[in-house]
C-alpha cells in the first residue's frame, strides 16, 4: 500500500470517529421525539422458584395461606381483635351468625313456610328400601329434652381466655376468637359474604378494613410461614379473588400487597378457575359453598363464563343458625346458648358438623351427647334427642326461605364497571371513542347473521368494545335489571349469544331477581346461561362442589338426585350422566381452590401474568387489564 493510500484510509477512519462523537453528543443533548403513551413492557421470562411464591386465599371466616410447595396451607380464623384507644370506649363486635333481616315481623312466618316445604320434600322422597319416611315432630323430642340436666365432668375445661395482660395492640386468629368479652377489644371480621366488610360502624371504613387484612396476613406470614416481613421483597404472591369481584377492592388489595407489604410481584386469579386447577378438571360448573356466601360459575378450559356467574348471599353460617332455631324448637338442653356469644357460635358450628346430614335413610328419634368446654367454666356433658332437625337444617340450602331472611338481596350478578380514573382505556373509553360508523356496521352485520324476534332491532347496536366479556362488569353488588342493563348480559368469553338466548335469560332473571334461589335451582340456572348446548352438556357431567358449607354425609347423592329431577327434559335425553364431584382426588373440598393457586404457580403460562412492583407503581390498575387471566 502506497503512502497516499495509507493517508486516505486514516482520513476515512478519522471521519468515522468524528461521526460517532457527533452521535454521542446528540444522545447527551437529547433529540426531540414525538410524544407517545408509555408502552407497558412485556413480562420478563425468568425461572421462578415455587417455594418463593405465597398463595393467599382469603375467605369470610377462614384464611388459607401457604407456600406453593406446601402440602397443606396454614388455616386461620379470618378475624382480628383491636385494643380500644380510649378506656371509656364502647365495645364493638362484628356479627358472625347474626345478620341483618332476621328480626323482621315476617321472619318467623317465612321460616315456618320454608320448613313446611322442607318437610314436604323429605316425605316425598322414598328411602332406599322404597318406604316413605315417617315424619318426626319436634314435640316428640322436646318432651324428652326439657327434662335433661347437664352432668359435670371430672376434668375441668382446659379452655382459657386469651391473655391480654401485656396489652397487645391487636390479636389475630384463634387468639382473637377467645378474647374475653370483658376486655377492651373490638372484634372485626374484615371479609363478609366474600367482599370487603365495609360498613358504617366502628372499623367499617375501607382504610380500616385494609389495615385489618394487612395486620392478619402479616402476622400469619411471620408466625405460621416463618417468613420475616423484610424478606417479602424476595417473594411473590398469588391472590385468589371471588368470581364476582369488586374492581376497586381488588385494586386496593394489590396495592397493599405490593406497596405496603412489599411482595415483589403478584398474580390475581378467580377462585372458580383455581378450583378446576386444583381438582384436575378442564371444565366444570364450580359450586363454592362457603361460610357466608355461595358462588356458582361455569369454567371451560381455564375461562370463567361471565353470564354463568351467580352469588347467593347464604352459606354454612346460615345453616348453623337455622340448626340452632330447630334445636330450640326441639327443647335444646343448653338453654343459655346465644347467637351473639362467640364461644357459643363455635359450639353450634361443631354440633352442625357432627350431627347434620343429607341421608334420607336415617330416620326417627336418636339420642346424642355433646360437651361444653368454655373458659373459666366447668366442662359439662349434655344428652339431647333429635329427629328430623339434623336433615332439615342442611336442606335449607335448597329452600332458603327457611333461613328467615327478610328485606335483603339474596342473589347478585356481576355488572358493568363504574370506571376508574387511573384506567383511561377502560370499557367506558372504548364505548365513547368507538365511531358511530363502526357501531352501525357491527349492528347491521349482527342483524344479517342472527335471526331476530320482532321488536329486537337496535338493541345489540348499543354494545361496544370487546364482546367477549362485556356481559357486565364490576362491583360485587346486586344487579337491578332495568333498561340500562338490558344489553349487559351478552355472551361469555367463548362466543356471543343469539338474541333469543338474551331474551330468555332476561326473562329468567326477572323471575328470581331479589328472591332467595335454592342451590339446585341456582346450579341449573348457571348452566342454562352457557351459550351452547355442548357446553351445557359438559357442565352437567362435571358439577364440582368446593368449600366447607356442604360437607354433610350423602350430600353428593342428594344433590345429584335433585339436579337429575329438575334438569330440563331435553337434556335428560342427551346427557349421559350427571356427575357431582365433592371430593376430587380424595382432597378436602375446602382446600381445592388454594391447591389450584399452588398449581397455577407452577404453570409456564403464569410467567405472562406476573405484575411486578415497579410496573404497578408506574402503570397502576392498567396492569390488571394487561396481565389478569380474566377480562378486567
From Swiss-Prot:
Superkingdom in the source lineage: Eukaryota
Claim: Transcription regulation is one of the keywords in the record: yes
Protein location: Nucleus; Chromosome
Statement: the UniProt record of this protein carries the keyword DNA damage: yes
Entries under Pfam families matching the protein: Actin
Gene3D superfamilies: 3.30.420.40, Actin, Chain A, domain 4
Assigned GO CC terms: chromosome; nucleus
Function in brief: Plays an important role in the functional organization of mitotic chromosomes. Exhibits low basal ATPase activity, and unable to polymerize. Proposed core component of the chromatin remodeling INO80 complex which is involved in transcriptional regulation, DNA replication and probably DNA repair. Required for the recruitment of INO80 (and probably the INO80 complex) to sites of DNA damage Strongly prefer nucleosomes and H3-H4 tetramers over H2A-H2B dimers, suggesting it may act as a nucleosome recognition module within the complex.
Assembly behavior: Component of the chromatin remodeling INO80 complex; specifically part of a complex module associated with the DBINO domain of INO80. Exists as monomers and dimers, but the dimer is most probably the biologically relevant form required for stable interactions with histones that exploits the twofold symmetry of the nucleosome core.
Name of this chain's protein: Actin-related protein 8
Species the sequence originates in: Salmo salar (Atlantic salmon)
Amino acid at each position: 500500500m502506497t503512502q497516499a493510500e495509507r493517508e486516505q484510509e486514516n482520513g476515512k477512519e478519522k471521519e468515522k470517529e468524528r461521526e460517532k462523537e457527533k452521535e454521542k453528543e446528540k444522545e447527551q443533548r437529547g433529540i426531540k421525539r414525538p410524544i407517545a403513551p408509555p408502552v407497558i413492557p412485556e413480562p420478563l421470562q425468568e425461572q421462578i422458584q415455587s417455594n418463593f411464591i405465597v398463595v393467599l386465599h382469603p375467605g369470610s371466616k377462614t384464611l388459607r395461606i401457604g407456600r406453593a410447595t406446601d402440602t397443606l396451607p396454614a388455616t386461620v380464623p379470618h378475624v382480628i381483635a383491636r385494643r380500644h384507644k380510649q378506656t371509656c370506649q364502647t365495645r364493638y363486635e362484628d356479627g358472625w351468625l347474626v345478620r341483618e333481616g332476621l328480626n323482621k315481623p315476617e321472619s318467623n312466618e317465612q321460616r315456618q313456610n320454608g320448613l313446611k316445604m322442607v318437610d314436604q320434600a323429605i316425605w316425598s322422597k322414598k328411602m332406599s328400601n322404597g318406604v316413605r319416611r315417617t315424619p318426626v315432630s319436634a314435640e316428640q323430642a322436646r318432651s324428652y329434652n326439657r327434662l335433661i340436666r347437664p352432668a359435670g365432668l371430672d376434668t375441668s375445661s382446659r379452655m382459657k381466655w386469651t391473655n391480654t395482660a401485656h396489652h397487645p395492640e391487636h390479636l389475630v386468629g384463634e387468639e382473637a376468637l377467645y378474647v374475653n368479652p370483658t376486655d377492651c377489644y373490638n372484634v372485626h371480621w374484615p371479609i363478609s359474604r366474600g367482599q370487603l366488610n365495609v360498613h358504617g360502624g366502628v372499623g367499617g371504613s375501607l382504610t380500616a378494613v385494609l389495615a385489618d387484612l394487612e395486620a392478619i396476613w402479616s402476622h400469619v406470614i411471620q408466625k405460621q410461614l416463618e417468613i420475616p416481613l423484610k424478606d417479602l421483597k424476595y417473594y411473590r404472591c398469588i391472590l385468589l379473588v371471588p368470581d364476582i369481584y369488586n374492581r376497586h377492592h381488588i385494586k386496593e388489595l394489590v396495592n397493599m400487597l405490593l406497596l405496603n407489604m412489599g411482595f415483589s410481584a403478584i398474580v390475581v386469579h378467580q377462585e372458580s378457575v383455581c378450583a378446576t386447577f386444583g381438582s384436575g378438571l378442564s371444565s366444570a360448573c364450580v359450586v363454592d359453598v362457603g361460610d357466608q356466601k355461595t358462588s356458582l360459575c361455569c369454567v371451560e378450559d381455564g375461562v370463567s363464563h361471565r353470564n354463568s356467574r351467580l352469588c347467593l348471599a347464604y352459606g354454612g353460617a346460615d345453616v348453623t343458625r337455622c340448626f340452632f332455631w330447630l334445636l330450640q324448637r326441639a327443647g335444646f338442653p343448653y338453654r343459655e346458648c346465644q347467637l351473639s356469644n362467640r364461644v357459643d357460635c363455635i359450639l353450634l358450628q361443631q354440633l352442625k358438623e357432627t350431627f347434620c346430614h343429607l341421608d334420607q335413610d336415617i330416620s326417627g328419634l336418636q339420642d346424642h351427647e355433646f360437651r361444653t368446654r368454655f373458659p373459666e367454666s366447668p366442662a359439662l356433658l349434655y344428652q339431647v334427642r333429635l329427629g328430623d332437625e339434623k336433615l332439615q337444617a342442611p336442606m335449607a340450602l335448597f329452600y332458603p326461605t327457611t333461613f328467615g331472611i327478610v328485606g335483603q338481596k339474596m342473589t347478585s350478578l356481576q355488572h358493568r364497571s363504574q370506571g376508574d380514573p387511573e384506567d383511561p382505556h377502560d370499557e367506558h373509553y372504548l364505548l365513547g371513542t368507538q365511531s358511530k360508523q363502526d357501531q352501525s356496521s357491527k349492528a347491521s352485520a349482527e342483524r344479517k347473521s342472527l335471526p331476530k324476534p320482532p321488536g329486537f332491532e337496535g338493541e345489540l347496536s348499543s354494545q361496544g368494545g370487546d364482546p367477549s366479556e362485556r356481559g357486565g362488569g364490576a362491583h360485587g353488588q346486586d344487579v337491578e335489571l332495568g333498561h340500562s342493563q338490558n344489553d349487559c348480559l351478552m355472551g361469555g368469553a367463548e362466543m356471543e349469544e343469539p338474541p333469543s338466548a338474551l331474551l330468555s335469560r332476561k326473562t329468567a332473571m326477572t323471575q328470581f331477581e331479589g328472591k332467595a334461589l335454592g342451590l339446585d335451582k341456582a346450579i341449573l340456572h348457571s348452566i342454562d346461561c352457557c351459550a351452547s348446548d355442548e357446553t351445557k352438556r359438559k357442565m352437567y357431567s362435571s358439577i364440582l362442589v368446593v368449600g366447607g358449607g356442604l360437607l354433610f354425609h350423602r350430600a353428593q347423592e342428594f344433590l345429584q338426585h335433585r339436579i337429575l329431577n329438575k334438569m330440563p327434559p331435553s337434556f335428560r335425553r342427551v346427557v349421559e350422566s350427571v356427575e357431582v364431584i365433592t371430593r376430587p382426588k380424595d382432597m378436602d373440598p375446602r382446600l381445592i381452590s388454594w391447591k389450584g393457586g399452588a398449581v397455577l404457580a407452577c404453570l409456564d403460562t403464569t410467567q405472562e401474568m406476573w405484575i411486578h412492583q415497579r410496573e404497578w407503581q408506574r402503570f397502576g390498575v392498567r396492569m390488571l387489564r394487561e396481565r389478569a387471566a380474566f377480562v378486567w
